[in-house]
Protein backbone atom coordinates (compact mmCIF):
# COMPACT_ATOMS: atom_id res chain seq x y z
CA UNK A 1 0.00 0.00 0.00
CA UNK A 2 1.53 3.27 -1.12
CA UNK A 3 0.54 5.90 1.41
CA UNK A 4 2.85 8.20 3.41
CA UNK A 5 0.96 7.55 6.65
CA UNK A 6 1.12 3.76 6.32
CA UNK A 7 4.72 3.81 5.15
CA UNK A 8 5.85 5.87 8.15
CA UNK A 9 3.79 3.73 10.53
CA UNK A 10 5.49 0.61 9.16
CA UNK A 11 8.93 2.19 9.59
CA UNK A 12 8.12 3.02 13.21
CA UNK A 13 6.64 -0.40 13.98
CA UNK A 14 9.72 -2.14 12.58
CA UNK A 15 11.79 -0.64 15.40
CA UNK A 16 11.44 -2.77 18.58
CA UNK A 17 11.09 0.18 20.92
CA UNK A 18 10.04 -1.61 24.10
CA UNK A 19 9.78 1.01 26.85
CA UNK A 20 11.89 3.03 27.48
CA UNK A 21 14.03 2.20 24.43
CA UNK A 22 13.29 4.49 21.48
CA UNK A 23 15.28 2.44 18.93
CA UNK A 24 15.62 5.38 16.54
CA UNK A 25 11.91 6.15 16.20
CA UNK A 26 12.31 9.78 17.20
CA UNK A 27 15.15 10.23 14.74
CA UNK A 28 12.76 9.15 11.98
CA UNK A 29 10.34 11.82 13.13
CA UNK A 30 13.10 14.43 13.37
CA UNK A 31 14.11 13.69 9.78
CA UNK A 32 10.54 14.44 8.67
CA UNK A 33 10.05 17.59 10.78
CA UNK A 34 13.40 19.28 10.16
CA UNK A 35 12.76 20.07 6.45
CA UNK A 36 9.46 21.67 7.49
CA UNK A 37 11.29 24.28 9.54
CA UNK A 38 10.70 22.82 12.98
CA UNK A 39 13.18 23.72 15.70
CA UNK A 40 14.31 20.39 17.13
CA UNK A 41 15.22 19.93 20.78
CA UNK A 42 16.22 16.54 22.12
CA UNK A 43 15.55 16.28 25.85
CA UNK A 44 16.93 12.97 27.17
CA UNK A 45 16.49 12.05 30.83
CA UNK A 46 18.01 8.85 32.15
CA UNK A 47 17.38 6.07 29.64
CA UNK A 48 14.48 7.96 28.07
CA UNK A 49 14.54 9.84 24.77
CA UNK A 50 12.27 12.87 24.53
CA UNK A 51 11.63 15.28 21.68
CA UNK A 52 10.26 18.82 21.73
CA UNK A 53 9.85 20.31 18.27
CA UNK A 54 8.10 23.53 17.35
CA UNK A 55 7.48 25.70 14.31
CA UNK A 56 6.23 29.26 14.12
CA UNK A 57 6.49 32.31 16.31
CA UNK A 58 3.87 34.50 17.95
CA UNK A 59 0.42 33.37 18.92
CA UNK A 60 -1.13 30.31 20.48
CA UNK A 61 0.63 26.95 20.58
CA UNK A 62 -0.99 23.70 19.45
CA UNK A 63 1.02 20.61 20.36
CA UNK A 64 0.59 17.02 19.25
CA UNK A 65 1.80 14.55 21.88
CA UNK A 66 2.59 10.87 21.79
CA UNK A 67 5.00 8.10 22.66
CA UNK A 68 7.34 5.92 20.64
CA UNK A 69 7.67 3.17 23.26
CA UNK A 70 5.55 0.04 23.24
CA UNK A 71 4.76 -2.73 25.71
CA UNK A 72 6.60 -6.06 25.32
CA UNK A 73 5.04 -8.25 22.62
CA UNK A 74 5.22 -11.51 24.56
CA UNK A 75 6.13 -14.72 22.79
CA UNK A 76 6.65 -14.18 19.06
CA UNK A 77 5.18 -17.61 18.39
CA UNK A 78 1.77 -16.35 19.50
CA UNK A 79 1.71 -13.74 16.73
CA UNK A 80 0.56 -14.56 13.21
CA UNK A 81 3.53 -12.49 12.01
CA UNK A 82 6.54 -11.30 14.03
CA UNK A 83 5.40 -8.30 16.09
CA UNK A 84 8.10 -5.97 14.77
CA UNK A 85 7.67 -6.96 11.13
CA UNK A 86 4.63 -4.89 10.11
CA UNK A 87 2.22 -6.53 7.70
CA UNK A 88 -1.06 -5.59 6.06
CA UNK A 89 -3.80 -8.19 5.78
CA UNK A 90 -7.40 -7.54 4.81
CA UNK A 91 -6.91 -3.80 5.18
CA UNK A 92 -5.46 -4.06 8.69
CA UNK A 93 -1.94 -3.00 9.66
CA UNK A 94 -0.47 -5.50 12.14
CA UNK A 95 2.43 -5.04 14.54
CA UNK A 96 3.23 -4.05 18.10
CA UNK A 97 2.40 -0.36 18.43
CA UNK A 98 0.16 -0.21 15.36
CA UNK A 99 -2.70 1.16 17.47
CA UNK A 100 -0.80 2.27 20.58
CA UNK A 101 0.49 4.51 19.25
CA UNK A 102 2.84 4.48 16.29
CA UNK A 103 -0.06 4.70 13.88
CA UNK A 104 -1.13 7.97 15.50
CA UNK A 105 2.43 9.30 15.39
CA UNK A 106 2.62 8.63 11.66
CA UNK A 107 -0.76 10.30 11.14
CA UNK A 108 0.39 13.37 13.10
CA UNK A 109 3.66 13.78 11.22
CA UNK A 110 2.08 13.43 7.79
CA UNK A 111 -0.70 15.82 8.83
CA UNK A 112 1.97 18.36 9.79
CA UNK A 113 3.72 17.91 6.44
CA UNK A 114 0.53 18.53 4.53
CA UNK A 115 -0.46 21.46 6.73
CA UNK A 116 2.90 23.24 6.48
CA UNK A 117 3.10 22.73 2.73
CA UNK A 118 -0.39 24.19 2.35
CA UNK A 119 0.02 27.00 4.89
CA UNK A 120 3.73 27.81 5.31
CA UNK A 121 2.89 31.17 6.90
CA UNK A 122 0.41 29.83 9.45
CA UNK A 123 -0.06 31.89 12.59
CA UNK A 124 0.75 30.56 16.05
CA UNK A 125 3.04 27.65 16.80
CA UNK A 126 2.74 24.00 15.89
CA UNK A 127 4.63 21.66 18.22
CA UNK A 128 5.36 18.00 18.92
CA UNK A 129 6.06 16.46 22.33
CA UNK A 130 7.23 12.86 21.94
CA UNK A 131 8.60 10.50 24.60
CA UNK A 132 9.85 6.92 24.86
CA UNK A 133 8.68 6.53 28.48
CA UNK A 134 4.90 6.30 28.60
CA UNK A 135 4.17 2.59 28.81
CA UNK A 136 6.45 1.80 31.76
CA UNK A 137 7.45 4.05 34.67
CA UNK A 138 6.67 7.39 33.00
CA UNK A 139 9.24 9.01 35.30
CA UNK A 140 11.65 10.45 32.72
CA UNK A 141 9.28 11.20 29.87
CA UNK A 142 6.57 13.79 29.39
CA UNK A 143 6.57 14.77 33.06
CA UNK A 144 10.23 15.84 32.85
CA UNK A 145 9.74 17.66 29.55
CA UNK A 146 6.78 19.56 30.98
CA UNK A 147 8.81 20.52 34.06
CA UNK A 148 11.56 21.87 31.81
CA UNK A 149 9.13 23.78 29.59
CA UNK A 150 7.40 25.34 32.60
CA UNK A 151 10.72 26.33 34.17
CA UNK A 152 11.67 28.37 31.11
CA UNK A 153 8.28 29.94 30.60
CA UNK A 154 7.11 27.99 27.55
CA UNK A 155 3.45 28.37 26.69
CA UNK A 156 1.22 25.53 25.56
CA UNK A 157 -2.41 26.39 24.87
CA UNK A 158 -3.81 23.27 23.23
CA UNK A 159 -2.63 19.67 23.10
CA UNK A 160 -3.93 16.74 21.08
CA UNK A 161 -2.73 13.40 22.49
CA UNK A 162 -2.86 10.55 19.98
CA UNK A 163 -3.82 7.77 22.39
CA UNK A 164 -6.21 5.19 20.89
CA UNK A 165 -9.49 6.63 22.15
CA UNK A 166 -11.96 5.19 19.63
CA UNK A 167 -14.14 2.25 20.63
CA UNK A 168 -15.93 0.77 17.62
CA UNK A 169 -15.51 3.34 14.85
CA UNK A 170 -12.83 5.96 14.29
CA UNK A 171 -13.75 9.11 16.18
CA UNK A 172 -16.70 7.69 18.08
CA UNK A 173 -15.08 8.60 21.42
CA UNK A 174 -12.62 11.27 22.48
CA UNK A 175 -11.13 11.73 25.92
CA UNK A 176 -11.48 15.22 27.35
CA UNK A 177 -10.10 14.27 30.75
CA UNK A 178 -8.73 11.46 32.87
CA UNK A 179 -9.14 10.32 36.45
CA UNK A 180 -6.32 10.70 38.93
CA UNK A 181 -4.42 7.70 40.24
CA UNK A 182 -2.94 7.13 43.69
CA UNK A 183 -1.63 3.90 45.21
CA UNK A 184 -1.31 2.98 48.89
CA UNK A 185 1.22 0.46 50.19
CA UNK A 186 0.26 -0.64 53.70
CA UNK A 187 2.06 -3.00 56.07
CA UNK A 188 0.01 -4.09 59.08
CA UNK A 189 1.98 -5.48 62.00
CA UNK A 190 1.00 -8.38 64.23
CA UNK A 191 3.03 -10.87 66.26
CA UNK A 192 4.33 -14.07 64.68
CA UNK A 193 3.61 -17.31 66.50
CA UNK A 194 2.53 -20.93 66.36
CA UNK A 195 -0.96 -21.58 65.01
CA UNK A 196 -1.60 -23.93 67.95
CA UNK A 197 -1.01 -21.06 70.40
CA UNK A 198 -2.95 -18.10 69.00
CA UNK A 199 -3.16 -16.48 72.44
CA UNK A 200 0.61 -15.94 72.22
CA UNK A 201 0.44 -14.21 68.82
CA UNK A 202 -1.48 -11.53 66.94
CA UNK A 203 -2.65 -12.50 63.47
CA UNK A 204 -2.45 -9.40 61.23
CA UNK A 205 -4.76 -11.02 58.66
CA UNK A 206 -7.52 -11.44 61.22
CA UNK A 207 -6.87 -7.99 62.68
CA UNK A 208 -7.02 -6.31 59.26
CA UNK A 209 -10.14 -8.09 57.99
CA UNK A 210 -12.65 -5.50 59.31
CA UNK A 211 -10.51 -2.70 57.86
CA UNK A 212 -10.36 -4.41 54.47
CA UNK A 213 -14.12 -5.00 54.50
CA UNK A 214 -14.86 -1.34 55.18
CA UNK A 215 -12.21 -0.16 52.71
CA UNK A 216 -13.82 -2.21 49.94
CA UNK A 217 -17.35 -1.05 50.77
CA UNK A 218 -16.65 2.65 51.25
CA UNK A 219 -18.32 5.09 48.86
CA UNK A 220 -15.59 7.64 48.28
CA UNK A 221 -17.69 10.06 46.23
CA UNK A 222 -20.55 10.04 43.76
CA UNK A 223 -18.65 11.45 40.81
CA UNK A 224 -19.82 14.53 38.96
CA UNK A 225 -20.86 15.67 35.49
CA UNK A 226 -17.44 14.80 34.08
CA UNK A 227 -16.34 11.73 36.04
CA UNK A 228 -17.81 8.50 37.38
CA UNK A 229 -17.49 7.82 41.11
CA UNK A 230 -14.01 7.21 42.49
CA UNK A 231 -13.08 3.52 42.61
CA UNK A 232 -10.71 1.56 44.85
CA UNK A 233 -9.25 -1.82 43.96
CA UNK A 234 -6.95 -4.02 46.02
CA UNK A 235 -4.11 -5.07 43.73
CA UNK A 236 -1.88 -7.18 45.98
CA UNK A 237 -2.03 -8.90 49.38
CA UNK A 238 0.91 -10.81 50.83
CA UNK A 239 1.39 -12.49 54.19
CA UNK A 240 2.75 -15.61 55.82
CA UNK A 241 5.90 -17.69 55.59
CA UNK A 242 4.45 -20.39 53.36
CA UNK A 243 4.16 -22.76 56.30
CA UNK A 244 0.76 -23.91 57.56
CA UNK A 245 1.76 -23.80 61.23
CA UNK A 246 3.02 -20.23 61.52
CA UNK A 247 0.85 -17.21 62.29
CA UNK A 248 2.33 -14.39 60.18
CA UNK A 249 3.83 -11.31 61.74
CA UNK A 250 2.99 -8.89 58.93
CA UNK A 251 0.38 -8.32 56.23
CA UNK A 252 1.09 -6.24 53.13
CA UNK A 253 -1.80 -4.69 51.21
CA UNK A 254 -1.50 -2.59 48.05
CA UNK A 255 -4.55 -0.78 46.69
CA UNK A 256 -5.17 1.82 44.03
CA UNK A 257 -7.68 4.64 43.71
CA UNK A 258 -8.85 6.05 40.39
CA UNK A 259 -10.32 9.31 41.57
CA UNK A 260 -12.46 12.09 40.19
CA UNK A 261 -12.41 15.82 40.73
CA UNK A 262 -15.12 15.28 43.37
CA UNK A 263 -12.40 14.29 45.85
CA UNK A 264 -8.76 15.20 46.40
CA UNK A 265 -5.81 12.90 46.93
CA UNK A 266 -5.39 14.48 50.38
CA UNK A 267 -8.95 13.49 51.32
CA UNK A 268 -8.24 9.93 50.17
CA UNK A 269 -5.12 9.77 52.32
CA UNK A 270 -6.88 11.17 55.38
CA UNK A 271 -9.92 8.90 55.11
CA UNK A 272 -7.78 5.81 54.56
CA UNK A 273 -5.63 6.51 57.60
CA UNK A 274 -8.74 7.24 59.66
CA UNK A 275 -9.97 3.74 58.81
CA UNK A 276 -6.66 2.19 59.85
CA UNK A 277 -6.81 4.05 63.14
CA UNK A 278 -10.47 3.16 63.67
CA UNK A 279 -9.52 -0.50 63.91
CA UNK A 280 -6.49 0.25 66.11
CA UNK A 281 -4.04 -1.31 63.69
CA UNK A 282 -0.29 -0.93 63.93
CA UNK A 283 0.73 0.00 60.42
CA UNK A 284 3.08 1.76 58.06
CA UNK A 285 1.69 3.39 54.94
CA UNK A 286 3.33 4.99 51.91
CA UNK A 287 1.64 6.65 48.97
CA UNK A 288 2.46 7.03 45.28
CA UNK A 289 0.54 9.69 43.36
CA UNK A 290 0.70 8.92 39.63
CA UNK A 291 -1.36 11.85 38.48
CA UNK A 292 -4.12 14.29 39.30
CA UNK A 293 -7.45 14.21 37.47
CA UNK A 294 -7.91 16.76 34.71
CA UNK A 295 -10.77 17.89 32.56
CA UNK A 296 -11.03 19.99 29.40
CA UNK A 297 -14.37 21.71 29.23
CA UNK A 298 -16.09 23.40 26.33
CA UNK A 299 -13.72 25.56 24.34
CA UNK A 300 -11.70 26.02 21.19
CA UNK A 301 -9.96 22.62 21.21
CA UNK A 302 -13.04 20.52 21.87
CA UNK A 303 -14.91 22.46 19.20
CA UNK A 304 -12.12 21.88 16.68
CA UNK A 305 -11.83 18.17 17.44
CA UNK A 306 -15.56 17.53 17.26
CA UNK A 307 -15.90 19.53 14.06
CA UNK A 308 -12.97 17.75 12.41
CA UNK A 309 -14.16 14.28 13.39
CA UNK A 310 -17.66 14.95 12.10
CA UNK A 311 -16.32 16.51 8.90
CA UNK A 312 -14.60 13.25 7.91
CA UNK A 313 -16.69 10.57 9.65
CA UNK A 314 -20.14 12.14 10.06
CA UNK A 315 -19.95 11.03 13.71
CA UNK A 316 -20.69 13.12 16.79
CA UNK A 317 -17.98 11.85 19.15
CA UNK A 318 -18.84 10.92 22.72
CA UNK A 319 -16.83 12.69 25.41
CA UNK A 320 -15.32 10.38 28.01
CA UNK A 321 -12.96 10.38 30.99
CA UNK A 322 -12.88 6.59 31.32
CA UNK A 323 -9.86 4.33 31.21
CA UNK A 324 -6.41 4.58 32.73
CA UNK A 325 -4.01 7.47 33.00
CA UNK A 326 -2.20 9.06 30.08
CA UNK A 327 0.51 11.66 29.62
CA UNK A 328 -2.26 14.20 29.24
CA UNK A 329 -2.20 14.47 33.04
CA UNK A 330 1.26 16.05 32.89
CA UNK A 331 0.53 18.34 29.95
CA UNK A 332 -2.60 19.67 31.67
CA UNK A 333 -0.31 21.11 34.36
CA UNK A 334 0.76 23.74 31.81
CA UNK A 335 -2.79 25.07 31.75
CA UNK A 336 -3.38 23.63 28.29
CA UNK A 337 -6.66 22.34 26.96
CA UNK A 338 -5.98 18.62 26.42
CA UNK A 339 -7.97 16.17 24.29
CA UNK A 340 -7.12 12.61 23.28
CA UNK A 341 -8.09 11.30 19.85
CA UNK A 342 -6.73 8.21 18.18
CA UNK A 343 -7.63 4.92 16.49
CA UNK A 344 -9.75 2.03 17.75
CA UNK A 345 -8.30 0.51 20.91
CA UNK A 346 -9.72 -3.02 20.69
CA UNK A 347 -6.34 -4.74 20.23
CA UNK A 348 -3.93 -2.52 22.18
CA UNK A 349 -1.38 -4.46 24.27
CA UNK A 350 -2.69 -7.70 22.75
CA UNK A 351 -1.16 -10.34 20.51
CA UNK A 352 -1.78 -9.43 16.85
CA UNK A 353 -2.30 -5.76 17.66
CA UNK A 354 -3.69 -4.05 14.57
CA UNK A 355 -5.34 -0.96 13.20
CA UNK A 356 -7.32 -0.22 10.07
CA UNK A 357 -5.03 1.26 7.40
CA UNK A 358 -7.94 3.32 6.09
CA UNK A 359 -8.56 4.67 9.60
CA UNK A 360 -4.96 5.87 9.89
CA UNK A 361 -5.26 7.68 6.57
CA UNK A 362 -8.48 9.32 7.71
CA UNK A 363 -7.02 10.10 11.15
CA UNK A 364 -4.22 12.06 9.51
CA UNK A 365 -6.80 14.16 7.64
CA UNK A 366 -8.67 14.78 10.90
CA UNK A 367 -5.44 15.88 12.60
CA UNK A 368 -4.72 18.25 9.71
CA UNK A 369 -8.20 19.74 9.95
CA UNK A 370 -7.66 20.32 13.69
CA UNK A 371 -4.47 22.22 12.87
CA UNK A 372 -6.41 24.33 10.39
CA UNK A 373 -9.10 25.09 12.97
CA UNK A 374 -6.65 26.16 15.69
CA UNK A 375 -3.68 27.92 14.08
CA UNK A 376 -4.92 29.36 10.81
Curated annotation (Swiss-Prot):
Record-level GO BP terms? diaminopimelate biosynthetic process; L-arginine biosynthetic process; lysine biosynthetic process via diaminopimelate
**Required co-factors:** Zn(2+); Co(2+)
InterPro entries noted in UniProt: ArgE/DapE_CS, Bact_exopeptidase_dim_dom, DapE_proteobac, Peptidase_M20, Peptidase_M20_dimer, Peptidase_M20A
Q: Does the keyword Transmembrane helix apply?
A: no
The catalytic activity of this protein is classed by the Enzyme Commission as 3.5.1.18
Q: Which domain of life is it from?
A: Bacteria
Catalysis performed (reactions): N-succinyl-(2S,6S)-2,6-diaminopimelate + H2O = (2S,6S)-2,6-diaminopimelate + succinate
CDD domains to which the protein is assigned, alphabetical: M20_DapE_proteobac (cd03891)
Q: Name one GO molecular function term.
A: zinc ion binding
PANTHER family (UniProt xref): ACETYLORNITHINE DEACETYLASE (PTHR43808), N-ACETYL-L-CITRULLINE DEACETYLASE (PTHR43808:SF31)
Q: What is this protein called?
A: Succinyl-diaminopimelate desuccinylase
Recorded source organism is Proteus mirabilis (strain HI4320)
